[in-house]
Swiss-Prot record:
Keywords: Cytoplasm, GTP-binding, Initiation factor, Nucleotide-binding, Protein biosynthesis. It comes from Mycobacterium ulcerans (strain Agy99). Residues 441-612 form the tr-type G domain. The lineage of its organism: Bacteria, Bacillati, Actinomycetota, Actinomycetes, Mycobacteriales. Residues 450-457 are annotated as: G1. The gene is infB. This is Translation initiation factor IF-2. GTP binds at residues 450-457, 500-504, 554-557.
Length: 945
């Protein structure tokens, strides 16, 4: 504790008991609890003064006596002035004035070098203590040199604590100044040391002695003059260590002399092993406690004023610059070698491959290469790409950024990522387990494809002996239907699974899913219509999936049917009939009349037996594909799945895409419950926690926990991919146009099936109207319109599109109250047409200027009611009231965008005046002259198609 002392230490120092000290403190108005309590330095000083300077005990040993003699030498020197023993009130006043009021004290002239003879006394009211006398050893020891007498006005230094060993003196010894260089002219007022309770003033540094040995060695055990000074006592120059260092020249030493040491320089500034003292004349005050960084460079340039840094342990001064470690040098070298991308230094790769998922962010990329995401963001910004650290980034941007840093960025496809995900759970998809002996024959899966209204569903109705077509809105198929029928082939009952796909152009994804999940494709072509666009698309899907095609030429019973023409047209697309020497089977049928249906079934079975190896392992865990899914109000999420391998049973834990659950019930196409589904069997599965996506692969896992983890990871991947796809890239060049006001139509899509919603969204997003309007689907889902959808639409100004669904509960009432528009559709192309019209209606109108007529100003009249009236003659065309006008003077436009406020013919208000008539009009403009022309026009909105 700097400046503080305990009561028992003071009692021991003064030679009295602790009770006497406590009593004396109580008389002085100081409340002290016990002998172990501490008192402040001013209180200790007044206590010593009240005891008459203290009663010092004689030295009991050589070592201890030497230490005490150093501290109390000014009191024992013979011939000292009596003023040295009495309290110096003038010195206290000078100290209070210097510390409290900040007034500079007068600077004495530099003192000469100290000599063994006593120094002449100076006036006590000078305000600055002269250089401290060199302490002498006690009388019991042989002093090496005669001691100096204390100067007049010098106060005895307090020693609050018991002196320690000679090598580590007590921190309470009297402050002083070390010898230093002679101060230059213009020296500033020395500042008080860091101890605000000290009664001593900083002194001028005496001129250092020449380096020479003192006559007489110091007593053994005494403090070494050349070592660390005792507290703030000024050390003797020279000594056993070979004399003091020569005074430094040049810039002052910043901070503490040694790391962790107190303030001051090593040998030419104030400070010691404990509390730092004044660093000499003009030096910054040392300070701080031991172990803390001190401030104030000792031995600084004379006249330099120290700061408060370093006082009371506060860090001060500049840090010492050390050598760089090898690691720091290597990091600096690597930073210099790093590539600069967009003005930012980034890590330099060695050509290694970085695998990133589609829709990854810059944070994901930075984690892979151990870089700072902020640096990647800044680099892309300087390259003209504005992306945040957590925003999904496109594949091209990631690859470009990686190539600049010498990394080979590979964006993992969704299929590869899903395969890696399943492999992490020791699962595989798409392969039959077991050997060849475990494989059994399965029924063929046949997909019926073709153009809209060519009779696909009627053909399936004829085969199934049902009427599905009448139940479809608009007479067109808008879902994928899966059925399994039994046919008689050569006296043997065979099963065939049929999948019906939509033929409308909006259902491209459905047809693609049907082609991937099938073994054989039946291409239905109307004999009276020929090959149409969706026919060509169906051919492309089947050929891309490497699926054999059987062509069914339908409607041969209608007028104008020409099956030969169909065969010729399909030849252009690689489908050559067997009649023409090809390998594609053609069957002429009539689905309405039921003609040649058995021949078509036989052609399908022959193709399956001849070209395909239709076998699967029924004993493994089931795998397949979800062809369709919807949300049933009473049963919850329902998925139509096609088992491709294995056997699906009630109670199995399944995962399909980002949906999972346990099979609670299975229903076939006739609505009957099924306990198990063998390969190639389509069933409706009830028990999913959410609606699976159409076309998602499903598989059976061991437990629900694994299914949930797989579904959660797929859901996160789906969100990232969707965010990357929907994010509109904005470059700095396009920033101006991006900031312009654009109209956006927000939609919420709800449908009865997942595939229908997907097809509707893709069709709507394909509408191209203009860059000024944009279409955004903010939410999509399967099932009825709920209050949550209405609240979201109200918050985002969206329109709700319901496809084959209605509003549930109080959703309609809430929509009416919130002003949310709900549109219901049952035919997909009606929804597409109306949304396209709505987008066109949101376009900003384009106005075209149509000139009406010109009028010449013949006279001007002023009216106190209406202002300036122009008497005009209509020279051409017609002038209408409230029409736009511009003023022409010498065929130069004077002012634009005027309005004809009033129009009169004689005394009657009129709406228009034709050519050859006079009239009076007001324009709300006063700078009119005779001879000016008024040109009238109107803006007509132009239709934007």
């Amino acid at each position: 504790m700097a400046g503080k002392a305990r009561v028992h230490e003071l009692a021991k120092e003064l030679g009295v008991t602790s009770k006497e000290v406590l009593a004396r403190l109580s008389e002085q108005g100081e409340f002290v609890k016990s002998a172990s309590s501490t008192v402040e330095a001013p209180v200790a000083r007044r206590l010593r003064e009240s005891f008459g300077g203290g009663k010092s005990a004689p030295a009991k040993g050589s070592d201890t006596g030497a230490a005490k003699g150093v501290a109390k030498a000014p009191q024992k020197v013979s011939g000292a002035s009596p003023a040295a023993k009495a309290p110096d009130r003038s010195l206290d006043a000078a100290l209070d004035k210097a510390v409290g009021n900040g007034a500079p004290a007068p600077v004495p002239a530099p003192a000469p070098a100290p000599t063994p003879a006593p120094a002449p006394a100076q006036p006590a009211d000078s305000g600055v203590a002269p250089p401290a006398a060199t302490p002498a050893a006690p009388a019991a020891s042989a002093a090496p040199a005669p001691p100096k007498a204390p100067l007049p006005g010098q106060r005895p230094a307090p020693t609050p604590g018991k002196p320690a060993a000679p090598q580590a003196p007590h921190p309470g010894m009297a402050p002083g100044a070390r010898p230093g260089p002679v101060p230059k002219q213009g020296v500033r007022t020395p500042r008080v040391g860091n101890n605000p309770f000290s009664s001593a003033q900083p002194v001028d540094r005496p001129i250092p002695r020449p380096q020479a040995p003192r006559p007489g060695a110091p007593r053994p055990g005494a403090p070494r003059p050349g070592g660390a000074s005792s507290g703030n006592m000024p050390p003797r120059p020279g000594g056993a260590s070979g004399g003091p260092r020569p005074p430094r020249t040049g810039a002052p030493r910043p901070g503490g002399g040694r790391p962790g040491g107190p303030g001051g320089g090593r040998s030419d500034g104030g400070g010691g092993n404990y509390r730092g003292g004044g660093g000499g004349v003009g030096a910054a005050p040392g300070g701080g406690f031991r172990g803390r960084p001190g401030g104030g460079g000792g031995g600084g340039r004379p006249g330099q004023r120290g700061g408060a840094a370093g006082a009371f342990g506060r860090p001060g001064g500049a840090p010492r610059r050390g050598r760089k470690s090898k690691r720091a040098k290597r990091a600096e070298y690597e930073n210099m070698q790093a590539p600069v991308v967009g003005g930012v230094r980034l890590p330099h790769g060695n050509g290694e491959t970085i695998r990133l998922a589609r829709g990854a962010s810059l944070s994901d990329f930075a984690d892979k290469i151990n870089a700072n995401p902020a640096a990647l963001v800044q680099a892309l910004f300087n390259l003209g790409e504005m992306v945040t650290a957590t925003q999904s980034v496109g594949d091209e941007t990631l690859e470009l950024l990686g190539s600049e840093m010498n990394y080979n960025v590979q964006v993992v496809s969704p299929e590869d990522e899903d395969r890696e995900l399943l492999e992490s759970f020791d699962l595989t998809y798409g392969e039959d387990s077991g050997d060849e002996s475990e494989l059994q024959t399965r029924p063929p899966v046949v997909t019926v494809m073709g153009h809209v209204d060519h009779g696909k569903t009627r053909l399936l109705d004829t085969i199934r002996k049902a009427n599905v077509r009448e139940g479809e809105a608009g007479g067109i198929t808008q879902h994928i239907g899966a059925y399994q029928v039994s046919v008689d082939h050569d006296g043997t009952e065979r099963l065939i699974t049929f999948i019906d796909t939509p033929g409308h152009e909006a259902f491209t994804a459905m047809r693609a899913r049907g082609a991937k999940a099938t073994d054989i494709a039946i291409l239905v072509v109307a004999a009276d219509d020929g090959v149409m666009p969706q026919t060509v698309e169906a051919i492309n899907h089947a050929q891309a999936a490497d699926v054999p095609i059987v062509v069914a030429v339908n409607k041969i019973d209608k007028e104008g049917a020409d099956p030969a023409k169909i065969r010729g047209q399909l030849t252009e697309y690689g489908l050559v009939a067997e009649d023409f020497g090809g390998d594609t089977m053609f069957v002429d049928i009539s689905a309405k009349q039921g003609t040649n249906i058995e021949a078509l079934e036989e052609a399908v079975l022959l193709t399956a037996d001849a070209a395909l190896d239709l076998r699967a392992n029924p004993d493994m865990e089931a795998q397949g594909v979800a062809i369709e899914a919807h949300l049933d109000r009473g049963r919850g999420p329902v998925a139509t799945v096609l088992v491709q391998r294995g056997t699906l049973r009630v109670g199995d834990s399944v995962v399909a895409g980002d949906a999972y659950g346990r099979v609670r019930r299975m229903v076939d196409e006739h609505g009957e419950d099924v306990e198990e589904a063998l390969p190639s069997r389509p069933v409706q599965v009830i028990g999913f926690t959410s609606v699976p996506g159409a076309g998602d692969n499903f598989l059976v896992v061991d437990e629900d926990r694994i299914a949930r983890q797989i579904a959660d990871r797929r859901s996160a991947r789906k969100r990232n991919a969707l965010a990357a796809r929907s994010r509109k890239r904005i470059s700095l060049e396009d920033l101006d146009s991006a900031l312009k006001e654009t109209s956006q139509l927000n939609l919420i899509l709800k449908g009865d099936n997942a595939g229908t919603v997907e097809a509707l969204e893709e069709a709507l997003m394909g509408i191209e109207v203009d860059d000024e309007v944009a279409l955004r689907v903010i939410d999509r889902g399967v099932g009825g319109i709920t209050e949550t959808n209405v609240n979201l639409a109200s918050a985002s100004d969206a329109i709700i599109i319901g496809f084959n669904v209605r509003a549930e509960g109080k959703a309609t009432e809430l929509a009416n109250r919130e002003g949310v528009e709900i549109r219901y559709y049952s035919v997909i192309y009606q929804a597409i047409d109306e949304i396209e019209k709505a987008l066109r209606g949101m376009l900003k109108p384009i106005y075209e200027e149509v000139e009406l007529g010109r009028a010449e100003i013949r006279a001007l009249f002023r009216s106190s009611k209406v202002g300036l009236i122009a008497g005009c003659m209509i020279s051409s065309g017609v002038v209408r009231r409230n029409a736009k006008a511009r003023l022409l003077r010498d065929n130069i436009v004077v002012v634009e965008n005027l309005s004809i406020r009033s129009l009169r013919r004689e005394k009657d208000d009129v709406t228009e005046v034709r050519e050859g008539f006079e009239c009076g009009m007001t324009l709300g403009y006063s700078d009119l002259k005779e001879g000016d022309f008024i040109e009238s026009y109107e803006l007509v909105q132009k239709d934007r198609s």
